[in-house]
């Protein structure tokens, strides 16, 4: 993950950014962010959804440590949403639960932007 390890950014900042973005994707279905942050967040999101496919106490605890409160859901509601609505959509799918769509560059600083979204797998 050398592409996300920038000068002046601490490990705590990087971990918190991933936690915020994972929570937002699970809450809203998609987010718009920079390409590098989207790719970094996608890795953790895939692992969290894979863990959530089996609903037990230990898996809920493992997932909860990566989630944060969002504007619409708190951590407990977000965990229930993940285990009851999001993960069952992907039971027959082995990975590839999300995708990164490139949007082009941001006007202000020419940073590549992207959308990170969950794939709508209903079967």
From Swiss-Prot:
InterPro entries: Ribosomal_bL17, Ribosomal_bL17_CS, Ribosomal_bL17_sf. The keyword Ribosomal protein applies. Keywords: Ribonucleoprotein, Ribosomal protein. The keyword NADP does not apply. GO terms for biological process: translation. GO terms for cellular component: cytosolic large ribosomal subunit. One of its GO terms (molecular function) is structural constituent of ribosome. PROSITE patterns: RIBOSOMAL_L17. Belongs to the bacterial ribosomal protein bL17 family. Part of the 50S ribosomal subunit. Contacts protein L32. HAMAP family: Ribosomal_bL17. This is Large ribosomal subunit protein bL17. It comes from Mycoplasma genitalium (strain ATCC 33530 / DSM 19775 / NCTC 10195 / G37) (Mycoplasmoides genitalium).
């Amino acid at each position: 993950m050398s592409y996300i390890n920038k000068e002046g950014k601490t490990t705590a900042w990087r971990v918190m950014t991933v936690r915020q973005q994972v929570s937002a994707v699970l809450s809203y279905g998609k987010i718009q962010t920079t390409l590098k942050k989207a790719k970094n967040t996608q890795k953790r999101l895939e692992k969290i959804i894979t863990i959530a496919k089996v609903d037990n106490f230990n898996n809920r605890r493992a997932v909860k440590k990566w989630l944060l409160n969002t504007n619409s859901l708190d951590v407990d509601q977000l965990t229930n949403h993940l285990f009851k609505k999001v993960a069952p959509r992907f039971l027959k799918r082995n990975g590839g639960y999300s995708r990164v769509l490139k949007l082009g560059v941001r006007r202000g600083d020419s940073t590549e932007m992207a959308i990170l979204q969950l794939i709508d797998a209903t079967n």
